[in-house]
Amino acid sequence: MGGGRLPPLWLPLLIAWSEWGNCCLDAPPVVRSPCLQPVRDRNRERNPGSPQLLPYGDRLEVACIFPAHDWPEVSIRVHLCYWPEIVRSLVVDARSGQVLHNDASCYIAGGRWRFEDGGAAQRLSLSFRLITETAGTYTCVLGNETHSLATETTALVADVHDLRHSDRSCDLAFGSRSQTRYLWTPDPSRLRSINCGWEGERHRVVHYIPGTSGLLPSCEEDERELCVPFISQSIADNNCSRRHRVDGARRRYHLRRDYWLTDPKIGLLAAGSVALTSLCHLLCYWCSESYRRLNTEEESEAAEETAAGEASAVAAAAVSEEEQRRE
């Protein structure tokens, strides 16, 4: 064998497999790549418009379409809900189609990527199985020598954990249309729930859309900071929140009825408000009375002056007539 050691038989298969992005046998990261740098303030990553709840465990594809050869680098930037502080990136040279950096498909369950040059447009896609660990935001990013530009962001949610209090029942309702900031699913009738039991005084329920793979979400609790805003905004108008508002109104009614006289702070606040209101009314009454009295005095003085003037005129006329008679 010439003293050299032949590579194992599986190495060509592994190299061929890596062309589809299943392995991380790509070039080392390009540290100065614009697509790996933070997006500038004027080109911040766009907020996802409509987080989607899709079938759990099904394979889906996130595709980014770019104008051909307008940008030297194209990328898909991934923020996973389980690790929001870690950013994964798939960066491809738009001219040659070679991968420059890839730590996205390696850490995503069943992750595969593909780059296609269609002449007028280029397409970079990342496919994977949607499970709890792959939920997050996927952002299309363009890069040149100076900066990067985020063009589109897709938010995907695999499951929703709901903690319910024992004295309140909730009926979560997800929308069937894409609405800004609200979680939606193409077919709400397929929504299913898993009963995860009680945690103290709260009942844990996991909502999901069953997929063809048969995979089910776990009942294990996790913060998933990135997905929490999507979920909390999405369920803000469901029956649970309406029931919560009714309960809050009932509590406020009992507060006004039962605790008005027993809480000294409320009594002092009420007494101060009544005293301040009474003082304002007294000041207004005093000002109005003073103004009315002043106007009355001015009018009486003007009337007296007018009467005196008229009397003087009558006397002068009488004197002049008397003088004319004497003449």
Swiss-Prot record:
Superkingdom, natural source: Viruses
Biased composition (Low complexity): 305-319
Keyword rRNA processing belongs to the record: no
UniProt keyword Glycosyltransferase present: no
Region annotated Disordered, chain positions: 298-327
Sugar-modified residues: N144, N239
Coiled coil: none
Keywords from the UniProt entry: Glycoprotein, Signal
Database matches in InterPro entries: UL141, UL141-like_sf
Signal peptide: 1-23
Protein name stated in the entry: Uncharacterized protein UL14
